[in-house]
Every structure is written in C-alpha cells, then in structure tokens.
Amino acid sequence: MCCGIKVKYVEDTPATKAEGGTFTPQDYRIKLVSAIAVDSYSTKHVSSVENMEMEAIPETAPIVTLESTDNYGQTYKPWMYGAEMLVLPISWKMENKEEMLKQHTMELVYIEDESNESSTELVFYLRHNKGTDTKTDVFAVRNKAYDVKKIMSDFKEKHGSYPTTIRIKAKIDMD
C-alpha cells in the first residue's frame, strides 16, 4: 500500500539565523488538499515482447487515459512515490456494475531486452484485461501503484544512473 498526498503552497516563512552565521532550512506553509490510499502491485518482468504475449499477460481492452481529469478540472498524471513506486491514475470504460470492477486487472510489464547500455529511458507496458466485462457504459478511474524498486536498481546497475524518463506504453481508446 502506498499513499498520495497533495498539498497546496500557501506562503514562505522567513528563514531565521542560527548561531554561527548559518541559516536554518526554509520553512513553508502548506495546506493539505487530499490524501489517498493506493493499492500496490508487483511489476511483471519478461525478457521480450514475444514472451509477454506467450506468458499469459492478457490485454483484452484499451484504457482511456493515464492523465485523468477530475470534476474540478485538476489533471492527474503518473508520478513516482520515492524511488520504488510508480503510481498510475488509470481511466478505462466498463459496465456500470460493482462486480464488473473486480473483473478488470492492470498489469505493468517491464521487458528486459528493450534498453541498450546508453539508454536513459525506462519503458513499461500497461496491459488491461477486462475479464468477462463486455460493456463500456461508464468510466472508471483508479490510482494503482506498482513496485519498481528492483527494476530501478537493475537499470542503475546496467546504465550507471537512474532513468531520466519513464515511458508507459498502453493501448488507448477514447471512444
């Protein structure tokens, strides 16, 4: 389980002088906007795109977006929670029944042979399996956190530094 905390900057507070002529760290006044619990999931590792298809990581439906906008106009994008959790605000369509929500699974897949030694980009595939759901009556949005600690560590070991970019490949359909 991970959490998402959103705060809003209110104002700076003046830095105060400590003994010895050094300054204390800057303080900030912030307002808590929201806090949410996010379920966490393991990230799948496969050696190639072909193995992703063969290892039964089904993709039976597209998602709508990874940049969801709420009723107040606030857009949520994927973010890192520390260096170990990648949080995705995933939106998809489904039948308007609670039991159908349980049918939908989202798997994040890392393909080991996709990066070369000079790569600065880490690529994941998001696979949406709709189960037995056959309708697209309503939008569903969920924040899902994926454990990427081992992948980040392996990337740093292979490339000498952490990635500068994370790309998520997913089938998208807005209709």
Residue map of PLM features:
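First exposed extracellular module after export/assembly in secreted or surface-exposed proteins
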Residues: M1-D175
